[in-house]
Amino acid sequence: TEYGIKYKLDLAEIMWSPGNTGWRSALSGPEKVSEFYRFDKPKTIIDYFAGIGYFSIQMAKGYPEAEVIAIDKNPKSIEYLTLNAKNNAVENLEIINDDCRNIERKADVIHLGYIGNTIDFLEHAYDYLNDNGTVIFHEAYRNNWLGFKSRSDWGAIPENFSDLMSQNSFTVEKFERVKFYGPSTSHIIARLKKN
């Protein structure tokens, strides 16, 4: 159980990162996390890499009037996601077992909770994001590219990152370091607004 959500999974088959504790909380956790996940009456939220429901179940609970679509191409993840949605009495969650790039559904919010070439999925997200829509973007970058030299740098929006998102037609509204991801590398989260 984490922030009121019960998860069932087999660690031999499915990824679970203890370093993401708090960041999976969406609206029910620490204020610095909730700020990323506060949306103005979204009608549709899509989680592109839903896994076992780390974020999509929290968003379905936090936005009961919204349609939440959870997509993952791993059948084992979908099996646990379906079970976790049932165990948490989530009724506004549609689960799709497919590659997110095969899904052509419009949304007010698209969650890209993935590490490793997340940028490759940003164009698809842009194409299916409603005007003024929001993307929650996770990725790992080298600290020197981000300009992280000390802890005081962690809350600032790095110029390189801002430029990269601008090239992809997004404005960075909010940026935070989640955790160290390896030597001189940080897992980051950003809230992006469609231009």
Feature names for model-found ranges:
Residues 98-167, 173-176:
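S-adenosylmethionine
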Residues 71-109, 117:
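S-adenosyl-L-methionine
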Residues 22-41:
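Conserved alpha-helix/loop element of class I SAM-dependent methyltransferases that forms part
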Residues 42-49:
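Conserved class I S-adenosyl-L-methionine
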Residues 1-19:
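Non-catalytic substrate-recognition/targeting regions of SAM-dependent transferases
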Residues 181-195:
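Core SAM-dependent methyltransferase catalytic element
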Residues 52-65:
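Conserved SAM-binding loop of SAM-dependent methyltransferases across substrates and taxa
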